């Protein structure tokens, strides 16, 4: 599943290509693309035409387009089109005569003639049109801030983590504590901070927990600079190009490879129906 850096890459692309433009029409081609919308695809199609995109925003793994009523001159957005990429979703900028993808699920036509395609092979992603509450789509208002958010309070997040007796990796994957972190970046930030994924959070000092969050910010900033992590053609930017941070991974997917710090072989253990990758020497469980 695309994590924070991959979603941010898409958000930046949509910002470049959509902000300031008016939506001429929208077409939802597959019911699963609007499965969470009351009224389904027709509800989106009927209510989005004529609106102008004023901003592209993100929180964690969710992104949304802020929409304003262009004819009225309204400048304060109160409506948003939420986009969740799911496992394989892509938001692509296309010319009108582009060959149609067999996995095209929905599309938007802009006033400059460009089309914005939602392509989703596995159909876990979706669009949702709804109200913004304090600038965030109502549907994801419960999602926590992420480590790249300027408003993120690392001290407060660290205190929240320390108050829990669960494994630190399990907590990092909880989007209501800190958002945007999935399996890849959890492994990478734990490796950088030298913390075992099964270490109980309440046994870590507040200072160590803040170091871990800073490690997450550092790792994701580097990943973002490289276009995110792409293991196949499903994770791409709005122009269809893949990122290359997979070449810089230190833990995730590195089973049997020497640790970049000490040379010990990286190991993989099953955790929460997925794998945890770590160095048994650098990341000792305490």
UniProtKB/Swiss-Prot annotation:
Keywords, alphabetical: DNA damage, DNA repair, DNA-binding, Glycosidase, Hydrolase, Lyase, Metal-binding, Multifunctional enzyme, Zinc, Zinc-finger
Name the record gives this protein: Formamidopyrimidine-DNA glycosylase
EC number: 3.2.2.23, 4.2.99.18
Single GO biological process annotation from the record: base-excision repair
Repressor is among the record's keywords: no
Catalysed reactions listed for this entry: Hydrolysis of DNA containing ring-opened 7-methylguanine residues, releasing 2,6-diamino-4-hydroxy-5-(N-methyl)formamidopyrimidine; 2'-deoxyribonucleotide-(2'-deoxyribose 5'-phosphate)-2'-deoxyribonucleotide-DNA = a 3'-end 2'-deoxyribonucleotide-(2,3-dehydro-2,3-deoxyribose 5'-phosphate)-DNA + a 5'-end 5'-phospho-2'-deoxyribonucleoside-DNA + H(+)
Known role: Involved in base excision repair of DNA damaged by oxidation or by mutagenic agents. Acts as a DNA glycosylase that recognizes and removes damaged bases. Has a preference for oxidized purines, such as 7,8-dihydro-8-oxoguanine (8-oxoG). Has AP (apurinic/apyrimidinic) lyase activity and introduces nicks in the DNA strand. Cleaves the DNA backbone by beta-delta elimination to generate a single-strand break at the site of the removed base with both 3'- and 5'-phosphates.
Stored NCBIfam families: fpg (TIGR00577), PRK01103.1 (NF002211)
Cofactor: record remark: Binds 1 zinc ion per subunit.
Zinc fingers, FPG-type class: 250-284
Residue numbers annotated as active site: 2 (schiff-base intermediate with dna), 3 (proton donor), 61 (proton donor), 274 (proton donor)
Native species: Corynebacterium glutamicum (strain R)
Molecular function in Gene Ontology: 8-oxo-7,8-dihydroguanine DNA N-glycosylase activity; class I DNA-(apurinic or apyrimidinic site) endonuclease activity; damaged DNA binding; zinc ion binding
Cofactor: Zn(2+)
Positions annotated to bind DNA: 103, 122, 164
Complex formation: Monomer.
Cross-referenced PANTHER family: FORMAMIDOPYRIMIDINE-DNA GLYCOSYLASE
Family listed: Belongs to the FPG family.
């Amino acid at each position: 599943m695309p994590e924070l850096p991959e979603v941010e890459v898409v958000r930046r692309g949509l910002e470049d290509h959509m902000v300031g433009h008016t939506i001429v029409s929208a077409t939802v081609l597959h019911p699963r693309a609007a499965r969470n919308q009351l009224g389904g695809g027709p509800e989106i199609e009927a209510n989005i035409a004529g609106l102008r995109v004023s901003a592209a925003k993100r929180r964690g793994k969710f992104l949304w387009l802020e929409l304003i009523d262009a004819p009225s001159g309204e400048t304060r957005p109160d409506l948003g089109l939420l986009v969740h990429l799911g496992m394989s979703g892509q938001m692509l900028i296309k010319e009108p005569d582009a060959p149609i993808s067999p996995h095209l699920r929905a599309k938007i036509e802009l006033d400059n003639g460009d089309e914005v395609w939602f392509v989703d092979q596995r159909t876990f992603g979706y669009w949702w049109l709804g109200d913004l509450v304090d600038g965030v789509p109502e549907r994801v208002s419960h999602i926590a801030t992420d480590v790249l958010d300027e408003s993120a309070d690392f001290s407060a997040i660290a205190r929240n983590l320390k108050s829990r007796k669960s494994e630190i990796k399990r907590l990092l994957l909880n989007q209501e504590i800190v958002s945007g972190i999935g399996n890849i970046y959890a492994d990478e930030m734990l490796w950088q901070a030298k913390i075992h994924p099964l270490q109980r959070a309440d046994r870590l000092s507040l200072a160590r927990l803040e170091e871990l969050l800073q490690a997450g910010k550092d790792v994701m900033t580097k990943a973002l600079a490289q276009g995110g992590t792409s293991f196949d053609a499903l994770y791409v930017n709005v122009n269809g190009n893949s990122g290359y941070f997979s070449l810089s991974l230190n833990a995730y997917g590195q089973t049997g490879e020497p640790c970049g710090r000490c040379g010990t072989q990286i190991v993989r253990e099953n955790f929460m129906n997925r794998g945890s990758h770590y160095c048994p020497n650098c990341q000792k469980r305490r």
